[in-house]
């Protein structure tokens, strides 16, 4: 059947094709405005999608709707942690809400400014402007501090940096600890004190917090916040997502599209058990062991201890990966015969 298109002037066909392409793009742009994963694929075409990215995207969608207010994501290095949490997330949310005030923090000011610069440059790009009609103020575009034309603000700071006088609708904390911090209980405590005395107090009513980090130690920021949650019913209630590099049940990679099993096993073989379990499996343990700790053992001094026939020990370790597990218990008992009655004691 003759379509009749051969009678349409070529310039009209080109205009029609352009309109179709534009309509298709607008449909994708609208989808990207409402779905984080769609947005990621539009602004980052080379993105290698993994199962954990879908889980994170679902959490970020809930964050955008206000259904989720407190989120902790623990994940291994080189698994798109910062790209998702400190680059794509703030740019997406700022596009959806150009009046949003975002505070971005990480373990150094230099890295925080790098995140700010990268996010700012994305929002100034043609690709981004095709999705969101948001402009940045020409007189406020420093890497660590910039504003939208509609009153939104982005402020970046390193752990320990001054945040006084700043308000935040969204607080993003990306890896608050460095490698050196993991070796220093004082540094871990400092990061927690800075969080509670600084950024946490800058949050606006109804604001949200996202902590996305690699685990380093039992007393890192994740560990301290979860213990505080367990102790105080009024404390922040966190939704926690843990991503081990190798799945415990199968020993297969979390992100097989990018990480081969043999590559992860090579990393494992190059690290101490403690570093591998903390940083790559999100299961930090103390240097004294995970189940039975040295400081739990006590010497029982008893004069004239009789000859013992049997010594019995029982252990209820309450072993769990959770920071809020029940206490472990250890008991020691014994039996011996008393003479001349041969009564068991």
Show which residues each predicted segment covers.
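Conserved RecA-like ASCE ATPase "motif II neighborhood" in helicase/translocase motors
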Residues: 144-186, 192
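An active-site-proximal beta-strand-loop segment
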Residues: 315-328
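ATPase catalytic-site recognition across NTP-hydrolyzing enzymes
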Residues: 249-317
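Conserved small/polar residues in nucleotide/adenosyl-binding loops
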Residues: 335-341
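N-terminal accessory segments
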Residues: 1-69
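Conserved nucleotide-state-sensing and coupling region of NTP-binding domains
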Residues: 105-163
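Signature of the SF2 helicase/ATPase Hel1-core->accessory helical subdomain module
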Residues: 176-247
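Conserved P-loop
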Residues: 74-76, 81-127
């Amino acid at each position: 059947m003759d379509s009749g298109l051969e009678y349409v002037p070529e310039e009209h066909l080109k205009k029609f094709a352009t309109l179709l392409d534009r309509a298709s793009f607008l449909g994708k742009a609208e989808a990207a405005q409402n779905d984080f994963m769609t947005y990621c694929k539009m602004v980052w075409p080379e993105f290698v999608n993994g199962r954990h990215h879908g889980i994170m995207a679902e959490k970020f969608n809930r964050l955008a709707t206000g259904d989720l207010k407190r989120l902790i994501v623990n994940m291994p290095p080189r698994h798109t942690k910062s790209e998702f949490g400190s680059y794509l997330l703030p740019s997406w949310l700022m596009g959806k809400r150009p009046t949003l005030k975002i505070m971005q923090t990480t373990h150094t000011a230099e890295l925080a400014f790098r995140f700010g610069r990268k996010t700012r440059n994305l929002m100034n790009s043609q690709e981004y402007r095709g999705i969101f009609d948001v402009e940045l103020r020409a007189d406020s575009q420093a890497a660590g501090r910039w504003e939208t034309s509609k009153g939104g603000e982005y402020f970046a700071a390193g752990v320990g940096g001054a945040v006084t006088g700043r308000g935040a609708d969204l607080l993003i904390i990306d890896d608050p600890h460095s490698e050196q911090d993991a070796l220093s209980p004082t540094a871990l405590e400092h990061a927690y004190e800075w969080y509670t005395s600084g950024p946490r107090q800058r949050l606006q009513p109804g604001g949200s917090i996202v902590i996305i980090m690699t685990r380093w130690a039992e007393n890192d920021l994740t560990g301290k916040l979860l213990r505080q949650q367990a102790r105080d019913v009024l404390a922040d209630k966190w939704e926690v997502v843990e991503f081990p590099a190798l799945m415990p049940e199968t020993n297969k990679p979390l992100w097989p599209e990018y990480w081969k099993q043999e590559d992860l096993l090579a990393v494992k073989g190059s690290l101490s058990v403690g570093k591998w379990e903390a940083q790559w499996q999100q299961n930090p343990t103390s240097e004294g062991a995970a189940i039975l700790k040295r400081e739990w053992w006590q010497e029982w001094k008893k004069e004239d201890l009789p000859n013992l026939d049997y010594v019995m020990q029982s252990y209820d370790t309450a072993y769990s990966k959770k920071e809020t597990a029940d206490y472990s218990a250890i008991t020691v008992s014994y039996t011996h015969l008393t003479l001349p009655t041969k009564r068991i004691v």
